[in-house]
Amino acid sequence: MVLSCELTLKELLESGAHFGHQTSRWNPKMKPFIFEEKNGLYIIDLAKTLAQLKKAVSCIQKTVEQGKSILFVGTKKQAKQIIKEAAIECGEFFASERWLGGMLTNMATIRNSVKTLNNIEIDLASSNSVLTKKETALLAKRHRKLLNNLEGVRHMNSLPGLLVVIDPGYERIAVAEAGKLGIPVMALVDTNCDPTPINHVIPCNDDSIKSIRLIVNALKDAIIDTKKRSGFEILSPVRPIERPAEEIVEGLPLPNEAQNDANSKEGFLVWTDTDNSEALR
C-alpha cells in the first residue's frame, strides 16, 4: 500500500511555503522550482512542491518498511523545536541544537560521548556517591551540555538510512557527511540553496515556522502510519538508557580502567573536560 500525501495547495499557500528569497540571493539551480518573480522575491511553484512532497512520502514509506532509521536535522531557530517534537512523536532520531562534526563519519567518537553521558547520569543518580556539592554541580553542568547536544542521537547505534534536513545550506556539514557515506538526503530547500547534493528536494520556504511545521508533520505522519501498518514499535529517541548491572562497579560504570586510575577520587570517577570536547562546546 502506497501512502498518499494529504496536504493541499491551499494549505501550502496559507503557510507561506511559496515565498522564496530575494532575487539577488537566489541559486540558479533552483530555477526549475520557481514559478515567478514578484516584488523582488522569487515565488516557488507550489504544484511542484506538492509533487515533490508526494515523492518524499513514498521515500519515507520505503525507508521505514526496510527497517532503516531516519535522522531529522534542523539546528536553526525556526526548525529546532519542530523537528525535535516530530522526531520524538514518530520515534526517530534528531539533531536540533548543534551538528557535531563527525556525527556520521566518526560515529565511534560520538558513541564515546554518549557513554560518558550515560556514566555521568549513573554517577549523579548514585545513592552511594561521596562527591562534594561542588563536584556534583560541575558534573551536573557537564551533563546538561552533553545532553543538549546528544539527546536526540544517544540511541543511534548505527548509521541512519535517511537524513531529513531543514535548510541544507545551513546544515551543509551534515549534508556533506551523508554524501561521503552514501546516505540519501531529503531536504526542505529554499531558492537560495544548491539542490545538487540533495536526493529528495522539497522546494519551499525553509525560514517560515508554519511552512516547516506543515511539511515536517506530513513526513512525520507518513512515518507513524507506515510503522503502525508494518507492526513496528514507536520508541522515543529520548527514552532513558538501560544499563546492564555488570557495567556498574560500586555504583559507577568503569568504561576504561586506565582512565579511572588516572582520574579517580575515593573510588569515584572524576570526569575531566578533556574528554568528548566536541560535544561540550
Swiss-Prot record:
GO biological process: translation
Segments forming a coiled coil: none
Keyword hit for Transmembrane helix: no
Keywords: Ribonucleoprotein, Ribosomal protein
GO molecular function: structural constituent of ribosome
UniProt-listed Pfam families: Ribosomal_S2
Record's GO cellular component terms: cytosolic small ribosomal subunit
Transmembrane annotation, as ranges: none
NCBIfam families membership: rpsB_bact
Family, similarity comment: Belongs to the universal ribosomal protein uS2 family.
Name of this chain's protein: Small ribosomal subunit protein uS2
